[in-house]
Amino acid sequence: MTSKKTLPKFQIAFALLILGGVLFLLHEVYQRETFLNETLHDHFSIEKNAYDVEFSINQFGYLYRLKFEDEKRVEYEFFVKTNPDNEYVVTYYGHNSKGDSPLREDEFTTLNAGY
């Protein structure tokens, strides 16, 4: 008699692989958001409690939308990417009041030098 059950070792390994991927993604999101907050504070003296952050991933990378408390209808969009030296770089895309502008790479402005 042969059993048609999958091996528990395979299921555990698969679950650990998925869990590792999710934890890596959450760690990257946290690290990049922290870097964005520090960059905005250091370069523009903007405190973290002045805005709300929304996160998404698209074909260009990690996108963060900032909504300031005093500008509810405007979203500011930033990408946090890595340069060839594996350092984080904050790239400002722009702002829109409708929330659905097309992304074009040539409109990006890098906030921190060295990229």
Label for each model-derived stretch:
Residues 76-115:
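Structured, soluble extracytoplasmic/luminal domains of envelope-associated proteins
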Residues 1-7:
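Short, Lys/Arg-rich N-terminal segment immediately upstream of the first membrane anchor
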Residues 4, 36-44, 74-76, 81-83:
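Structured catalytic/translocation cores of nucleotide/phosphate-coupled proteins
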Residues 44-73:
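Short extracytoplasmic
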Residues 24-52:
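Short, non-transmembrane alpha-helical segments in secretory-pathway proteins
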Residues 8-25:
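Hydrophobic membrane-insertion alpha-helices, especially the h-region
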